[in-house]
Amino acid sequence: MSEAFDLAVVGAGTAGLPAAMAAAARGLKVVVLEKSGRIGGTLHYSSGQMSAAGTQLQRARGIEDSPDLHYADVMRISRGLANGPLVRRAVDLAPRTIDWLMEIGFEMHPSCPAILHLHEAYAIARTYWGVDGGRSILKAVAPVFEAARARHGIDLRLGTATTRILPGEGVMARRPDGTEARIAARATILATGGYGANPGMFARLHAGMPLYTTASPTSDGSGHAMAEALGATLRNMHFWKPALAGIEDPAGSGRVAWEDVPALTPQVRQPWEIFVDAGGRRFVAEDHESVDIREAALARLPGLAFWVVFDEEILREAPPLLPRFDRARLEAAFAGHPHFVRADGVEALCARTGIDADGLR
């Protein structure tokens, strides 16, 4: 007989860990199934940015804010398209979450709370992140999770990939040795993350759009696929925008490191360069204060691709476009990476990149 649980949590990341702890604290017998060999999920890869209004940190810095103001700001930024009840729930619980993280030793970046312009900005400083991105969250939460495992008997199974949901009965899972097992559970929580590492699913759900991603390799859409197999409908797939911008590295991998994203935020670094499409035309004002407008312009381009064009003087005099690239790394990129192109003049540059020379002149 297989052991029976009250709850199976699929995924030991940002959502799965607190879900398991909360359920176990309420007396439920919990098993956590994680297909990778470690807990944390996307926290190993993400910048870990969070927002909350009415936190102790805000009060300590004299920032007047509230969940009501946070809610209004979200609805403003989303142009009223966000799910109101879900937003309400999130903003009401967010300050408690930030305060809890601080209590358990989260190492907050000293600039926080802040107004962050990498996304469409809030009107009030209510964005937070750790000194080491998402890893700062994991560093604080992991010991608390381990303590909860010891206290409540949470069964953590690493290297165990859930393959099928059995409604009301549990799940089927593949063990590290490749064998299949039925894990009995009265309820299941899917905390598998997104599908940002699954180009095929991304193309299916987003009209064939290409995928260049910073996502964790475990964000493969397996939870979505298991839910769809049961008849679930995926909604709001049209609500997405590309980030501006990233460098595929290595070329052909579809992977982008968020730490290497170019400094294209005008509130942080005013642009010296021009952004052009394949026709050589500037498709957006490079210094437009709204990232929403800039990303919407990018979304209209074929292949979601554009060129950042500059000359040697700009390279020499401007603040670094790629802050983590020293001169040696930049030279290596121009020498061997297909997304870095150098030429002696406009005609030669266009010949090498395929940019229309008449448009660029």
Predicted regions and their residues:
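An anion/pyrophosphate-binding glycine-rich loop and adjacent beta-alpha core
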Residues: 224-226, 230-355, 359
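Glycine-rich loop(s) and the adjacent beta-strand/alpha-helix scaffold that form part
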Residues: 176, 183-252
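A structured beta-alpha segment of the ubiquitous adenosine-cofactor-binding alpha/beta core
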Residues: 162, 172-182
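N-terminal Rossmann-like FAD-binding beta1-loop-alpha1 element of flavoenzymes
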Residues: 7-32
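A conserved short coil-to-beta-strand element within the FAD-binding core of flavoproteins
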Residues: 158-169
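Conserved N-terminal/central alpha/beta ligand/cofactor-binding core
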Residues: 29, 35-155, 159-160, 272-282, ...
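Extreme N-terminal leader/targeting segments of oxidoreductases
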Residues: 1-7, 25, 139
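Glycine-rich, N-terminal phosphate-binding loop of Rossmann-like dinucleotide-binding domains
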Residues: 12, 54, 175, 192-193
